[in-house]
Amino acid sequence: MSESLSVKSAESSIIDISNLCLTFETQTEPVHALSGINMKVNSGDFVSLIGPSGCGKTTLLRVIADLEKPTSGTISVEGKSPHEARLNRSYGYVFQTPALLPWRNIESNIHLPLEMSGYSKVEQKNLSQQYLSLVGLSGFEKKYPWQLSGGMQQRVSIARALSFDPDMLLMDEPFGALDEITRDRLNEELLRLWEETQKTVVFVTHSIPEAVFLSNKIVVMSARPGKIINVIETNFPK
């Protein structure tokens, strides 16, 4: 397979990556994390990144999110640099663990990005209620993270990522630490959210069944240095 395979179609792309490489300098020798990545993601796509551990899936997601800087190549997110897209709040990011602030209740955790974006108190309350309802957690506004199960906490993280209405969700193995039953249920909920909101989603996973169930496109990466070795379009009914 050519390493220049890309996620593309005739539609305009919301993420456009060309010949991107990333090398980490260490005290011993350079670590080549990504090599020759070419990828286009269209608006409304649900794209899963899969591949062996250490292949650069999370690193690629972090480059899109402006959390890592590429060594060479180009990347645009909604026609802007990743830095500009981050400042413009073009995406919400969901981490492997919920990353909720334990001293804030659930409602207040969802308010955090809204506070930073200058939303009024009334807007914050209305939006937190709207997105808690969307993820099935109405009535839990005043609870604290420690009072919720792991799956419920991750649903709060998704609500927080959606609260300021970004065009994209970037998700780094958000259900990887959960038991299989909870994970399957949250996958069904995430698929429903995607169908309802039509957000663009880039989703990192180790699970082939999860990728097939959720995605309309699957990007397969090689072992390090990470390259795109295949792009699979899934046409199964959801």
Regions found by a protein language model. Name each.
Residues G73-H83:
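Conserved ABC transporter NBD signature motif
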Residues I158:
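Hydrophobic anchor residue at the start of the ABC signature
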Residues A65:
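Helix-to-loop junction immediately C-terminal to a conserved catalytic motif
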Residues K143-W146, F164:
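Conserved signature/switch motifs of ABC ATPase nucleotide-binding domains
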Residues E115, V122-F140, R192:
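Conserved ABC ATPase "signature" region
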Residues R104-H111:
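Short coil-to-helix segment of the ABC ATPase nucleotide-binding domain corresponding to the Q-loop/switch region
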Residues I50-P52:
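The feature captures the beta-strand-to-loop junction immediately N-terminal to the Walker
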Residues L169-D172:
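Catalytic Walker B motif of ABC-type/P-loop ATPase nucleotide-binding domains
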